[in-house]
Amino acid sequence: MRKIVHVDMDAFYASVEQRDDPSLRGKPVVVAWRGARSVVCAASYEARIFGIRSAMPAVRAERLCPDAIFVPPDFTRYKAVSRQVREIFHRHTDLVEPLSLDEAYLDVTHAKTGMQLATEVAQLIRTQIREETQLTASAGIAPNKFLAKIASDWRKPDGQFVIAPSRVDAFLLPLKVNRIPGVGKVMDGKLAALGIVTVADLRQRPLEELQAHFGSFGQSLYRRARGIDERPVEPDQEVQSVSSEDTFSEDLALDALAPHILRLAEKTWLATRRTERIGRTVVLKLKTSNFRILTRSYTPEQPPTSQEALAQIALALTRRVELPAQTRYRLVGVGLGGFSDVENGAVQGQLFGQMPPLE
């Protein structure tokens, strides 16, 4: 039986800002550029009390908490701290799969320290992070990645939670289905319309029914409802692509997708900045009302150097969609692929310097 730990830094970017500037401690801090189309990168726990969350439009965050302190993100500092944390992980196992600067999966089945209990490994890792970075992390311990990720949210901030193999059903079945990664508001509503509110409800539905309603995602739902996730922890896997998607509550015409594409371009650009890598290929993904998926991509001579450039290419790709005008779409996604490392400071400044607003 595998022993998987999911470690997630607590309000990472905001916590780094509060650590480095004592005047920010205990105050609602929002890490974001100011601007009509900017989104929140991170919010301190003091800001979250007001309902502010990551990926929320910055203007909405200002309305929710007029006294919030907005701090522009500094990814160079965040990446330096992330390297510190990753070095701590590698003291315990070489099977480390980073998901972003602030979270990772670890397979500690055969920990380097010889420790047998995954809970003790997780506790030691969290203690070392606190002592060496003055930041806190939360951890989930479980037999697979899916369950470990859910568990890491259970005792946030600065806590850990274990789902023992013998307790998987007892933990999983009472959960609301929106606790399953990938089940957002729209999917949650569609499941509720079918009478599926909890994981126990979901488990009662046959695979064929879920696939009929949700296509390939139906199989994922079927497996997650049973706590099944056989994905291995893939050590230090380099990010090859980044994307953001929106599923609509009502199907839309192609010419109604532009506002969504603009917003998704910003989310994708922000996620790209977190990797500090260059994405060269722009990808537009669409799903029609009858679940047909199509993608269009374009690789310019020079990689996009701003969210505006990314958005304009994605918008242009809609003109390559050759379906009848009456076709309606239930999902749109914007992605960047073909990643390579940022090689020098000049290129990094050009790509990841000031983020211009989309007009």
UniProtKB/Swiss-Prot annotation:
Protein name (database record): DNA polymerase IV
Domain annotation UmuC: ranges: 4-184
Subunit details: Monomer.
GO process annotations (BP): DNA-templated DNA replication; error-prone translesion synthesis; SOS response
Active site: E103
Record-annotated membrane-spanning stretches: none
Residues where Mg(2+) binds: D8, D102
Species this protein is from: Xanthomonas axonopodis pv. citri (strain 306)
Top enzyme category: transferase
Encoding gene (name): dinB
Catalytic activity, reaction form: DNA(n) + a 2'-deoxyribonucleoside 5'-triphosphate = DNA(n+1) + diphosphate
